[in-house]
Regions:
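N-terminal secretory signal peptides that target proteins for export/translocation
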Residues: 1-8
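Boundary at the C-terminal end of the N-terminal hydrophobic targeting segment
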Residues: 25, 30-31
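Asparagine/serine/threonine-enriched low-complexity, disordered tracts
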Residues: 4, 40-98
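Bacterial N-terminal signal peptides
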Residues: 12-22
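Periplasmic c-type cytochrome electron-transfer domains
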Residues: 32, 37-40, 95-546
Length: 546
C-alpha cells in the first residue's frame, strides 16, 4: 500500500476515534447505573424501557384488557398515557441514563403495577440507589421497584440463580439464617441455598433484637433450628416493608421501633399523652439505621443523604394499574393506579376506628375503600363480557371488604384494650385509612400470626415467661414487646399499607401466606367469618387491584 493511502487511512482512524470518544465516556460514566438496572431487569419484566411502548406490553393474559374503547380515555393512569415526564425517562439534560420512567410498570401474577414519583421520574442518582456501606448493598437491594418496592421470594430466587447466590443481597448480617455463617464466596452453591433458605423461600430478612433489660418477661426457652438465637439477640424473620406510599404512613417498621414519641407534637392519640414525631423525621433515622445495619456502613449517612432518601421515598406512589381479568383499573371512572393517591386525603387520625375522625369529629366510616364505586353498575348477565364480569367481582369484593360482618375476638390491642370479648366489625375496623388500608394512628395488634400453633419447622420458637405471674407464652416473634418490654405487647405488629399488595407476596410480617387466597383463608378461619367460595374469590379479586 502506498504511503499516500496509509496517511489517509490513519487520518480516518483518528477521526473515528474522536467521534467515538464521547460515546465511550458516556458509557463508562453510566456503568454504575447500568449495573443497578441489569441487576433488577430494568425494573420492567418486559424489558421495555420506553413507557410510550407500554401499550404493546404483554402484561395481561386477557386479550380484552385493552379492547374497551372507553378504558384509556377516562384516566390519567392509562397504559396509553404519554406522561410528559416520560420524555426524560432514559436521559437527563446531559444525556446520561440515570433515570427510569415515571409510571414505571412491572408485571405480577395478577396484572401490572405502576410506580409514580412526584419528581417526574425515578432518580437513580438518589442515595437510595447507591452503595454506601461496606457489603455492596443499597436501599434498593431490598426495595426493588418491580417487586412492589420490597423483595419477593420469587424475585430473590431469580436473583440467586442469576448470581449463584453472590449478589450483595446474600450477606450473613441479615440474609443468612445464622449471622455467623461464612461469607457466601466461602460456601458451595448448595450450601448457600441452605444458609439463605428463609430469604429464598419467604423473602424474609433476619432481624436481631434482644429482650430489654427491664422487660416484664424473660426468655424461658428457645428452639432455633439455626442454632443462634438467645436472650441477647432473638432471630426474627420478617418481610421488608415497601418503600412507597409513605404519605399514608403512621408507623415505621413492623414493630414500630423507628416511630418515636415527641411530647411537643400535635399528632397525639386522643385521650392519651402519646404524641409522635413527624414520620419524615423517623424515616430519616430509619434510613441511617438501615445503612449502618443492613449495609454495614462504617459511618452515618449525612443529613443531606438522609433528606434525599426521605424526599425520594415520600414522593413515591405505587399501585396496581392493570388487572389480568378486569383490565385497566382507571376505566369507567375507577380510581385504581398510583396517581389517584396523590389527591387522596390523609392526616394523622383520619377515620379512626375507636374515636372517629381526629379533624372533622365524624364517626368512623366503615366504607373505607371507594376505588371501584363506579363499577357497582356492572350486573353480570349472559351477554356480559369477561371484563364486565371481572369488574363486577372487584366491586363485590370491595363491598365485602367494607361491610362483611366479622366478630373480632382475641385480638391483643383491641379486645383487651377495650375490655370487650367480642367486637363487631369488618375488615376496615383495622384497615381504616381511606383507600390505603393501614391504620391511621400507631395501633399494633396481635391477630395470631406469630402464635405457636402456626409455627413451621423453619421458624424459631420462643417461650416467654412473665416475671411477675409466671405465665408463659410461645411465639415465633414477640413483635412490639421487644421494643416496649411490655407483656401485653407480645405478638403485636402494625397493619401495612395495602396498595400494590399484588406485587409483593408472600404476606404477613413473616411471609407465612404464600398468596392472596391464603391471606383470605387465614382471616376466614381465624374469625369464623363463613365466607362462601364466591365471596373468597371476590375478595381476592378486589385485593389484587389495590
Amino acid at each position: 500500500v502506498s504511503s499516500k493511502y496509509k496517511i489517509k487511512l490513519k487520518t480516518v482512524s483518528v477521526l473515528l476515534l474522536l467521534l467515538a470518544a464521547p460515546l465511550i465516556a458516556d458509557k463508562t460514566a453510566s456503568a454504575e447505573r447500568t449495573t443497578y438496572e441489569e441487576r433488577n431487569g430494568s425494573s420492567n419484566n418486559n424489558g421495555n424501557s420506553n413507557s410510550n411502548d407500554s401499550s404493546n406490553s404483554n402484561d395481561s393474559s386477557n386479550s380484552n384488557d385493552s379492547s374497551n374503547s372507553n378504558d384509556s380515555s377516562n384516566s390519567n393512569d392509562s397504559l396509553n398515557s404519554n406522561d410528559s415526564s416520560n420524555s426524560n425517562s432514559n436521559s437527563n439534560s446531559n444525556g446520561s441514563a440515570n433515570r427510569m420512567p415515571n409510571m414505571l410498570r412491572s408485571t405480577n401474577s395478577h396484572g401490572t403495577d405502576a410506580s409514580y414519583s412526584t419528581a417526574g421520574f425515578i432518580d437513580l442518582d438518589n442515595p437510595f440507589f447507591k452503595s454506601i456501606g461496606t457489603n455492596g448493598r443499597s436501599c434498593a437491594s431490598c426495595h426493588i421497584p418491580s417487586q412492589g418496592w420490597t423483595i419477593t421470594a420469587k424475585g430473590v430466587q431469580e436473583l440467586f440463580e442469576k448470581t449463584e447466590g453472590l449478589d450483595p443481597l446474600f450477606r450473613p448480617v441479615d440474609g443468612a439464617n445464622n449471622p455467623e455463617s461464612p461469607h457466601p464466596d466461602q460456601l458451595t452453591l448448595e450450601e448457600r441455598r441452605e444458609v439463605y433458605s428463609m430469604l429464598l423461600n419467604k423473602g424474609n430478612i433476619r432481624v436481631g433484637i434482644g429482650i430489654p433489660a427491664d422487660a416484664e418477661f424473660e426468655l424461658a426457652d428457645v428452639d432455633d433450628p439455626y442454632g443462634f438465637a438467645s436472650e441477647t439477640e432473638l432471630s426474627l424473620f420478617r418481610r421488608p416493608m415497601p418503600s412507597a406510599n409513605f404519605k399514608f404512613l403512621s408507623t415505621v417498621m413492623w414493630d414500630g421501633r423507628e416511630t418515636t414519641q415527641d411530647p411537643t407534637s400535635t399528632d397525639c392519640i386522643v385521650g392519651t399523652t402519646n404524641c409522635f414525631s413527624p414520620v419524615s423525621k423517623d424515616l430519616a433515622t430509619q434510613s441511617n439505621h438501615a445503612t449502618l445495619g443492613h449495609a454495614e456502613a462504617l459511618h452515618d449517612l449525612s443529613e443531606e443523604e438522609q433528606k434525599a432518601i426521605v424526599d425520594f421515598e415520600s414522593g413515591l406512589f405505587s399501585a396496581q394499574i392493570l388487572d389480568n381479568e378486569a383490565g385497566e383499573l382507571t376505566a369507567e371512572k375507577a380510581s385504581g393506579g398510583p396517581r389517584a393517591l396523590l389527591e387522596q386525603n390523609y392526616y394523622f387520625g383520619i377515620n379512626d376506628t375507636l374515636v372517629g375522625d381526629y379533624q372533622t369529629g365524624a364517626a368512623f366510616n366503615p366504607n373505607v375503600m371507594s376505588l371501584y364505586d363506579s363499577w357497582y353498575r356492572y350486573k353480570p348477565t349472559k351477554s356480559s363480557t369477561s371484563i364486565e364480569i371481572a369488574r363486577a367481582a372487584v366491586a363485590r369484593g370491595q363491598t365485602l371488604f367494607n361491610t362483611k360482618p366479622i366478630n373480632i375476638t382475641g385480638v391483643r390491642g383491641l379486645n383487651d384494650d377495650l375490655d370487650v370479648e367480642v367486637l363487631p366489625g369488618t375488615c376496615t375496623t383495622c384497615h381504616n385509612t381511606p383507600n390505603s388500608g393501614n391504620h391511621s394512628t400507631p395501633m399494633p395488634l396481635d391477630i395470631g400470626i406469630s402464635d405457636a400453633s402456626r409455627r413451621t419447622p423453619d421458624m424459631p420458637l420462643y417461650t416467654l415467661r412473665n416475671k411477675t405471674t409466671g405465665e408463659e407464652i410461645q411465639t415465633t416473634d414477640p413483635g412490639r414487646a421487644l421494643i416496649t418490654g411490655k407483656w401485653k405487647d407480645i405478638g403485636r405488629f402494625k397493619g401495612p399499607i395495602l396498595r400494590s399488595v399484588a406485587s409483593r407476596p408472600p404476606y404477613f410480617h413473616d411471609g407465612s401466606a404464600a398468596d392472596l387466597p391464603a391471606v383470605v383463608d387465614f382471616y376466614n378461619n381465624r374469625f369464623n367469618i363463613g365466607l362462601t367460595k364466591k365471596e373468597k374469590a371476590d375478595l381476592v379479586a378486589f385485593l389484587a387491584t389495590l
